[in-house]
Amino acid sequence: MKIDIHSHILPKEWPDLKKRFGYGGWVQLQHHSKGEAKLLKDGKVFRVVRENCWDPEVRIREMDQKGVTVQALSTVPVMFSYWAKPEDTLNLCQLLNNDLASTVVSYPRRFVGLGTLPMQAPELAVKEMERCVKELGFPGVQIGTHVNEWDLNAQELFPVYAAAERLKCSLFVHPWDMQMDGRMAKYWLPWLVGMPAETTIAICSMIMGGVFEKFPKLKVCFAHGGGAFPFTVGRISHGFSMRPDLCAQDNPMNPKKYLGSFYTDALVHDPLSLKLLTDVIGKDKVILGTDYPFPLGELEPGKLIESMEEFDEETKNKLKAGNALAFLGLERKQFE
């Protein structure tokens, strides 16, 4: 069994959001040829996607070809829209979550849903989380690595974490809103470097901000192998010990204490990196994730895990499915 914790999906269509809300900045999907569509922001194309981004039957066909049993589906992070008026973001979240739920209901043995929330308005986010869990049956939600000017240690977000803990709602943290201009404008640097940096900041913010200390039952998984964190945790821990005046303002516990307290996906594209990741984060805490259907993802799901001579079969099976089930609070028999 292979369970992919990290895959993205969009509705086939949605209303003109600029017309609906009266201002720009929204993302639209424009179908321009058979099996292909443009993602537009304020009329400018920023990505072309194929039908596997919105058509579940095409997706299942490709999953079968690659041996993927189940995908956890989440929206494309550019849809988060935390910058917008909260009620408008909530409206969009409801649209996305309802569409996602209909896909999951149609194929319950192949898909699980991770909802999206208006995180810039924590009260609304909690209400939509409750709806996602209680009405739509989602085991978790996807959130961004920051919410406008808030990092994930922001006290304003603590009610969201409290609700997630109470509802047993898992959080999948995905980078977004990277710097795109200036020094980052060339070489695809926002995706190659900016995304791992975003994720590293998110992990450090949650650790040093006391989130894992205050909410010990919170289940969190960070995308892209936890960014640079697994490789730099020694530096982070040493710096914490040397400058507690700067690093221990909100939590006196050394960051290394929290290794094993959270999950990451296994999307690192390199055997040495995957070995380090499992050594640092824990073999029980790393989950197959592909970033399907995008080109920076793992094009042969599970191939890297299966190639690891250092891993016994039990470890490989944990990374391919068991750890995902534990993170999501689901049982294998639901998908067999």
UniProtKB/Swiss-Prot annotation:
| Cystines in this chain | none
Sorted keywords for this record are: Decarboxylase, Lyase, Metal-binding, Zinc
Which residues does the record give as Zn(2+) binding sites? H6, H8, H174, D291
Instruction: Report the EC code(s) recorded for this entry.
Output: 4.1.1.45
Its GO biological process annotations read: L-tryptophan catabolic process; negative regulation of quinolinate biosynthetic process; picolinic acid biosynthetic process; regulation of 'de novo' NAD biosynthetic process from L-tryptophan; secondary metabolic process
Pathway the protein takes part in = Secondary metabolite metabolism; quinolate metabolism
GO molecular function ontology, one term from the record: hydrolase activity
The protein's role, per its UniProt record: Converts alpha-amino-beta-carboxymuconate-epsilon-semialdehyde (ACMS) to alpha-aminomuconate semialdehyde (AMS). ACMS can be converted non-enzymatically to quinolate (QA), a key precursor of NAD, and a potent endogenous excitotoxin of neuronal cells which is implicated in the pathogenesis of various neurodegenerative disorders. In the presence of ACMSD, ACMS is converted to AMS, a benign catabolite. ACMSD ultimately controls the metabolic fate of tryptophan catabolism along the kynurenine pathway.
* Protein name stated in the entry: 2-amino-3-carboxymuconate-6-semialdehyde decarboxylase
> Gene for this protein?
ACMSD
